[in-house]
């Protein structure tokens, strides 16, 4: 039926009538009451106004489009137990494209306009002009530099020409003067003048000769320097080439020694091994001529001969260091009490040194020192010695972690590769890759998450009661955390994980056990902190969300508020353009339950979930426990394949044959396919929640892998602890032992949390650091106390309180919980606590000065000093410095202090006393003792 008035139109649009009246008035349609009639023109006017307000073109064509892109990556991080966890990181990118308006069809008469240059062309031309300007500037600078150089050369030439012209003028003038004087003076004076001229000419020639000699000497010196540099370079190059040739030369066969030709080149200075100039049979009676060289002389071409000649020198009678056996080499003549052998192995079995062999060492996760030495073909003592050089004391049977072993291999000159060659688990992956089985559709695995007070348990109970047969309803056991429900459109498997322990463990191991998450939110309560935590878990796992807004039957239910709060947490409903369906349900009346299951199945169809059926089963441990009568019991969710009774399964380090299989109703079953939860018995131990379960071909292989995992886990744990101790030691040494004050902060609102965290982190110094382990909004829960126990942190509650269970747990574990209402009180108390963690400042306070006037030596006591107190006071146990000629000789403590024969606590100025120094007797008369004490002063921030 077409709507004729405002009220009917509002009902059709599912919105309040007063809001519709406001929008009509904004659009220019004057309607005063809900009974006013609406025409089609009024509705078109309202629609055009709303489109204009939301940025949509009037003709209905979209002017902009928004694209969202998600990228999921994985990073690995070690947890507190040392196990490696995979954390998924999702990056979202959003880009909006706006369509520009097309130019109008009707325009003014066509006018030939100048060609339009786009921005890229303008930028290119600007860049070209800038380059041209830079080129012109460089050319101008080069031209200016050349002109300056030419001007300088011309100025120098002009100066030389002027000097030459001046010298010629002076010479001519002197000659004219000399002629005049010669005409005026008698003959003997002319003779004197000629002698003076001769002297001047000789002096000028000598100065020219000296200048030429100096220039020649400078040129000669420069040539000598260049020649010396070139000679040194050639010497180094020759030495390098000779050493390389010697190292790469093949080992020679044993043959009779041939006479060595004399080497004409001078011996190298400063070398220990010098080549022999004589033949081996000749005596060395004549002394060698002394060879002196200002520069480094060139070594012999045959460098290896210098090593061979050592034995010949010793056989000729030349004794070297430690060689007391008449030319025998070695540090000792022979073993104790035995005659010395005349056989020299080095003379006959000499081999040229070969190049070091670099090995590729495969390093597993853990390896002992002995195994690592065997892989590198070296002695274990060499490996232990290298470890000691690296600062780690170890034994031959000590287990090293992979990182330490790889560093050690690199230090010893080999190439290390991380490998798992001895890991029997490699066969599991190979077998899984080879299996090619057809995948069939499977049921979705759904995890129900949300706040405990939002009706999650009631919703699950209603689903059980509605979808499980009446006869089977009483057989449901409450401790099983997984069950499946049959619907007309298919089966759904629900996963109930209280506290989300299994969900977190599965996500950490990179296994995607959950396909869809149902987020339960109460309509009257809204989004709570645990709801935010559930949203974060679901986003980190990368699974779609289906939001169930519960308790819609309550009068205080407000769906719009819940939607707005969820939008603030980046959970956008489909009706607003998001990807999360919102379903209002009531666990009390059952309203909306079918629609919720329908949405879950729709999401499963979109995901196209498939798994192989005819193959060995694989799955995950949902939860496990130790039953008194049945032993280890594990609830397993089969992910692929079919699990049958009697199969040999492996779950982590636990293994065994499936002796019994029960479904969620407690009934015995013989097999279970994909997405079916079952409870199995027969394992050797209780596996961890989230461990991967797989069916093995035989029990022997399962036992081998299980025992290997047990040993590897133990070895890795021990190796990690050892490495952590060493790293912490070096880190503390490097940082000066920085102390940490770990904290967990819980506040009432987000603003208080940010302000408190910022204020406390500003208190960090170089010695004490505030470490905020966790900060969140809400009350203090048991999980916060458990985190505080693990991290040894202090819990600060700002306008929040801990619940009864959290208080009980904190009291049992000794966790300190502090409550504050004023932020400055919290900052002041934390500041005081950090001040108490600061190491006290030590200051010396001088007490007195003592002069030693007599020294008495007593056999059993040592040196006793008879002293006179010059200044201050002397106290027993005080620290002293011994001054000799005003130079500090020793610093220590007083051992005893006496006045006459009685022990004295202190001796004041002007009195005499006797004293002894602790572990020091080198005292003389006239020495002075400076007495002081060290005081510790508390520091503040």
Curated annotation (Swiss-Prot):
Residues 170-228, 252-351 are annotated as: Disordered. Residues 170-209, 271-297 have a biased composition (Basic and acidic residues). Residues 256-269 have a biased composition (Low complexity). Keywords: Cytoplasm, GTP-binding, Initiation factor, Nucleotide-binding, Protein biosynthesis. Residues 550-553 are annotated as: G4. CDD domains: IF2_eIF5B (cd01887), IF2_mtIF2_II (cd03702), mtIF2_IVc (cd03692). Residues 299-308 have a biased composition (Polar residues). Residues 586-588 are annotated as: G5. Residues 496-499 are annotated as: G3. GO terms for cellular component: cytosol. GO terms for molecular function: GTP binding; GTPase activity; guanosine tetraphosphate binding; translation initiation factor activity. One of the essential components for the initiation of protein synthesis. Protects formylmethionyl-tRNA from spontaneous hydrolysis and promotes its binding to the 30S ribosomal subunits. Also involved in the hydrolysis of GTP during the formation of the 70S ribosomal complex. This is Translation initiation factor IF-2. It comes from Herminiimonas arsenicoxydans.
């Amino acid at each position: 039926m077409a709507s004729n008035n405002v009220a009917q139109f509002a009902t059709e649009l599912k919105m309040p009538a007063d809001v519709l009246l406001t929008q009509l008035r904004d659009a220019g349609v004057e309607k005063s009451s809900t009974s006013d009639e609406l025409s089609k023109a009024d509705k078109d006017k309202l629609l055009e106004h709303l489109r204009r307000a939301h940025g949509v073109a009037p003709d209905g064509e979209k002017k902009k489009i928004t694209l969202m892109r998600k990228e999921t990556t994985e990073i690995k991080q070690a947890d507190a137990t040392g196990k490696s966890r995979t954390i998924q990181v999702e990056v979202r990118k959003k880009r909006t494209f706006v369509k520009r308006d097309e130019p109008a069809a009707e325009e003014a008469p066509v006018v030939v306009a100048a060609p339009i240059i786009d921005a890229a062309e303008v930028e290119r031309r600007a860049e070209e002009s800038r380059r041209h300007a830079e080129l012109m500037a460089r050319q101008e600078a080069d031209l200016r530099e050349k002109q300056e150089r030419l001007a300088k050369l011309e100025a120098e030439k002009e100066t030389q020409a002027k000097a030459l012209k001046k010298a010629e003028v002076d010479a001519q003038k002197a000659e004219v003067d000399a002629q005049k004087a010669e005409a005026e003076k008698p003959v003997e004076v002319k003779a004197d003048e000629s002698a003076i001229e001769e002297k001047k000419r000789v002096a000028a020639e000598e100065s020219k000769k000296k200048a030429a000699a100096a220039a020649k000497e400078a040129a000669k010196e420069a040539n000598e320097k260049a020649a010396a540099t070139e000679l040194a370079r050639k010497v180094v190059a020759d030495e390098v080439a000779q050493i390389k040739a010697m190292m790469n030369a093949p080992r020679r066969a044993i043959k009779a020694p041939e006479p060595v030709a004399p080497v004409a080149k001078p011996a190298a200075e400063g070398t220990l091994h010098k080549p022999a100039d004589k033949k081996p049979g000749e005596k060395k009676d004549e002394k060698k001529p002394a060879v002196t060289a200002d520069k480094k002389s060139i070594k012999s071409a045959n460098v290896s001969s210098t090593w061979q000649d050592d034995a010949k020198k010793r056989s000729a009678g030349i004794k070297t260091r430690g060689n007391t056996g008449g030319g025998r080499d070695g540090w000792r003549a022979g073993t104790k009490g035995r005659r010395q052998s005349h056989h020299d192995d080095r003379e006959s079995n000499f081999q040229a040194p070969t190049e070091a062999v670099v090995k590729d060492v495969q390093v597993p996760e853990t390896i002992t020192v002995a195994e690592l030495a065997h892989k590198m073909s070296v002695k274990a003592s060499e490996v232990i010695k290298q470890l000691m050089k690296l600062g780690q004391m170890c034994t031959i049977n000590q287990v090293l972690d992979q990182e330490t072993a790889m560093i050690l291999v690199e230090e010893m000159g080999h190439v290390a590769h991380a490998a798992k060659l001895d890991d029997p688990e490699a066969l599991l992956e190979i077998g899984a890759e080879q299996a090619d089985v057809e995948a069939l559709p499977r049921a979705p695995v759904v995890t129900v998450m949300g706040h405990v007070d939002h009706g999650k348990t009631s919703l699950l109970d209603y689903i059980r009661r509605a979808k499980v047969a009446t006869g089977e309803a009483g057989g449901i056991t409450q401790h099983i955390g997984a069950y499946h429900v049959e619907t007309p459109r298919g089966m759904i498997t629900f996963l109930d994980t209280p506290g989300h322990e299994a969900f977190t463990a599965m996500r950490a191991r990179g296994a995607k056990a959950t396909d869809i998450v149902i987020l339960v939110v109460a309509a009257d309560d809204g989004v709570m902190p645990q709801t935010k935590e559930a949203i974060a878990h679901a986003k980190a796992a990368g699974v779609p969300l289906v939001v169930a807004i519960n308790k819609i039957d309550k009068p205080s239910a407000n769906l719009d508020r819940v939607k707005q709060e969820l939008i603030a947490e980046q959970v956008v409903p489909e009706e607003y353009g998001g990807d999360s369906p919102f379903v209002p349900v009531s666990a009390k009346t059952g309203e909306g339950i079918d629609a919720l299951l329908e949405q879950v199945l729709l999401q499963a169809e979109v995901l196209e979930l498939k798994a192989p059926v005819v193959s060995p089963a694989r799955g995950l441990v949902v939860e496990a426990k130790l039953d008194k009568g049945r032993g280890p019991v594990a609830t397993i969710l089969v992910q692929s394949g079919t699990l049958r009774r009697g199969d040999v399964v492996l779950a982590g380090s636990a293994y065994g044959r499936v002796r019994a299989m029960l479904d969620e109703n407690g009934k015995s079953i013989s097999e279970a396919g994909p997405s079916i939860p079952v409870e199995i018995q027969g394992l050797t131990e209780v596996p961890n929640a989230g461990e991967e379960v797989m069916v093995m071909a035989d029990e022997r292989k399962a036992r081998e892998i299980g025992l290997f995992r047990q040993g590897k886990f133990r070895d890795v744990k021990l190796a990690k602890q050892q490495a952590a101790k060493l790293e912490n030691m070096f880190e503390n040494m490097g940082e000066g032992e920085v102390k940490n004050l770990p904290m967990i902060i819980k506040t009432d609102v987000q603003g208080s949390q940010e302000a408190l965290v910022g204020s406390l982190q500003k208190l960090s110094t170089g010695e004490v650091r505030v470490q905020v382990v966790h900060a969140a909004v809400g009350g203090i829960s048991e999980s916060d106390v458990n985190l505080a126990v693990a991290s040894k942190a202090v819990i600060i509650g700002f306008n929040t309180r801990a619940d009864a269970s959290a208080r009980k747990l904190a009291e049992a574990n000794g966790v300190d919980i502090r409550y504050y209402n004023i932020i400055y009180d919290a900052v002041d108390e934390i500041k005081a606590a950090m001040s108490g963690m600061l190491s006290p400042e030590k200051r010396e306070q001088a007490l007195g000065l003592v002069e030693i006037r007599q020294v008495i030596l007593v056999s059993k006591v040592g040196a006793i000093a008879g002293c006179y107190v010059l200044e201050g006071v002397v106290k027993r146990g005080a620290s002293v410095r011994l001054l000799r000629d005003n130079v500090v000789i020793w610093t220590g403590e007083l051992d005893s202090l006496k006045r006459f024969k009685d022990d004295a606590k202190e001796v004041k100025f002007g009195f005499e006393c006797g004293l002894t120094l602790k572990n020091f007797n080198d005292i003389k008369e006239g020495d002075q003792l400076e007495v002081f004490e060290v005081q510790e002063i508390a520091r503040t921030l």
